[in-house]
Amino acid sequence: MSIAPAAHTPMMQQYLGIKAQHPDMLLFYRMGDFYELFFEDAEKAARLLNITLTTRGASAGSPIKMAGVPYHSAEQYLARLLKLGESVVIAEQVGDPAASKGPVERRVSRVVTPGTLTDAGLLDETRDALIMAIAVAGDVLGVAWLNLAAGRFQVTELDRTALPALLARVRPAEILAHEHLDLAADCPVRRLDAWQFDADGASKRLARQFGSCDLQGFGVAEMHCAIAAAGALLGYIETTQRTALPHLLSIRAERDSDFVLLDAATRRNLELTETLRGDAAPTLRSVLDTTCSGMGTRLLRHWLHHPLRDRAAVAARRDAIGVLAAAPDSAARLADLLKRCADVERIGGRIALKNARPRDLSGLRDTLALLPELAAALPTDGARLAALRDAVAATPDVHALLVRAIQPEPASVLREGGVIADGYDAELDELRALTRDAGAFLLELETRERARSGIATLKVEYNKVHGFYIEVGRAQAERVPDDYRRRQTLKNVERYLTPELKAFEDKALSAQERALAREKALFEALLDTLIPHVPNLLSIASALAEIDVLASQAERASTLRLCAPEFSDDPCIVIRGGRHPVVEAQVEHFIPNDVVLNRTRQMLLITGPNMGGKSTYMRQVALITLMACCGLWVPAASARIGAIDQIFTRIGASDDLAGGRSTFMVEMTETANILHSATADSLVLLDEIGRGTSTFDGLALAWAVARHLVSATRAFTLFATHYFELTQLAQEYRQLANVHLDAKEHGADLVFLHAVEDGPASQSYGIQVARLAGVPGPVIHAARRRLRELEDAQLQPGPQGDLFAAHLPRDEAPPHPALDQLRELDPDTLTPKAALDMLYALKALTDSEP
């Protein structure tokens, strides 16, 4: 608004004052039973939510644009706005309308942003809502991210080139970025001024939050840029939440050496939790996820995106799955109990932020009651399961408190009452008794008034609009006693109030209001009592989530015929009978394949027809390796995995239109990243490098890339190609082996065998695949003819499409033998007689052909 606030009405001045503090957020301004939005906010909300935009009254001489949503259904509108990346400020009425001479006082009660969600109705139970802050110090970036609902605070430092991989792994819902950082992200980005990233102030703020004198004990004291980011993030959370954050008790430094690194392209190509089209299935997570709780689902997602390099931690998970797989009854019992558990992690966060709801506490109470059974259902073997059994130890004090304090089936919201259990508070019990006794009093009053008035049809009733009243028919109205005062006249009845009924009404309604106020105070006090227990509750939640994942993977191990991977100190990837878990779930029969990679067999050069299974084979090797590094069982007859530091994939590509990059540029960028970043302990998957340019350029690039990987990088590499010339590299490098996937022609059909065999492929079957794809017959015929001509002329194929050419069966007759003699003929060396003899010879050849 460009008009000075003083020119507006008092209520609009109040609105604009609040709006000025949050100019880039939508303001939900409470007015009675609605949240109203005004001016530009109203226009934006009407467009995004498809609600009515109207005008009401005027301020500063102009109509006020307005849109609103009902108070009781505001949550669904908030969810839609947050999904669209908007942030919302909620201003509630805090003053008494009856006592206010001007506008009712309003204050901001909360600020809701995509990365600070804790409300159950706004959160996706299958994924964490994370908020990230990024600070800049030269070429170094300091990054902090927080799961507010769970109280997990992490930091790292990295160079700018590593940021895309971190964003792909963490997947923040909201980013707070230094004003000078050039950043492209898939989530809302809020720019913060440079002064908000002051490292000294950040260090003090963080130490104060954690109750320590400094940050030495957290392992982050020397990470100055990361501390600056964490301080800016904490300041933002304090501003938006407007409450203490007692569950934020520590911060953890994350380092690249903790994880097997995957860049953004690899996560996308392997379809870990999202397909290339953005769908949730079919993906690795959709195949593996049979967890019973939101906590378990989120943890499994985290594991898949954070494969570990710590062999002890990975082996502990693998062995725990093995114990549960060997005890299917225990795993099934655990699953049954976990289905009945509430989301303790998020409930704990809401308790800490003092925005828990009644059913959060009843859900927590019922979950705590299940802990002894859960602990008893865990098998006694294995160190990891023993630690989890200790972690879910019962909390009798908290459980007993909640049993005493909360109704067995409380109301969904506090304002409805019926939340605090009877017997918990004497004052509340007394107030409730007054309300409960109203029914008996009204029946007794109705009997007395019928006798006193002589009106047998007289009724004593109540409604929320008019309160208590005595109702008689219009025909009986003349018979009512003199102390009856008319309260309401309807078509067929009259409603009255007596002094006695009025006195009771005042007492009863006052008791109801006082009971609601008392219940609210008791509930808030109960949250205060529970807050010191939040760290323990979050530990229990972490254990429940891990038990859920381990039990689900024990079930998957049996159902999907998975095996426990072995870990080797020698550098290798040896998989026998490996299968692609996602593809196998989609097809009736899947052909298993082996892979052997070690220091004497570093690269497999894979040839074969399109649709033959090269990409599936490469991806399954990567997925099996990744699953093993997550501590999961794998789809194979056996698997032995050495130390792996990174997994790279360059499989398929498309134009980056927004970034102005062609398909070939995307391919080369991803390839360059691999060549710069891969080490001898990396797993690299490359599919058809060089196909996006001319044949000679592409072949030269593919040859150079393969040669560099096998001779310089020495990474474990699966290299699929249609450049058959590359198969000759096996003669130069003994660490490179040729393998192929074959197909067989059966009449007019082409049967793909999907089996990996040693040696190079003999054909690509490109024209047959084109025919299977429905390319018109004349085009196929022309392609065969051109292919024959190219082969006969021994020409090097030029266009990209010719890379699929190979020795194909021909439909046409073979070349005439006279043509061979003509090709060998040199007219300049022939005498006239020799020329005549040659002519007769050629004539004889043509006469001999049918």
UniProtKB/Swiss-Prot annotation:
The keyword DNA repair applies. Disulfide bonds: none annotated. The keyword Repressor does not apply. GO terms for molecular function: ATP binding; ATP-dependent DNA damage sensor activity; damaged DNA binding; mismatched DNA binding. InterPro entries: DNA_mismatch_repair_MutS, DNA_mismatch_repair_MutS-lik_N, DNA_mismatch_repair_MutS/MSH, DNA_mismatch_repair_MutS_C, DNA_mismatch_repair_MutS_clamp, DNA_mismatch_repair_MutS_core, DNA_mismatch_repair_MutS_N, DNA_mismatch_repair_MutS_sf. This protein is involved in the repair of mismatches in DNA. It is possible that it carries out the mismatch recognition step. This protein has a weak ATPase activity. Belongs to the DNA mismatch repair MutS family. This is DNA mismatch repair protein MutS. The gene is mutS.
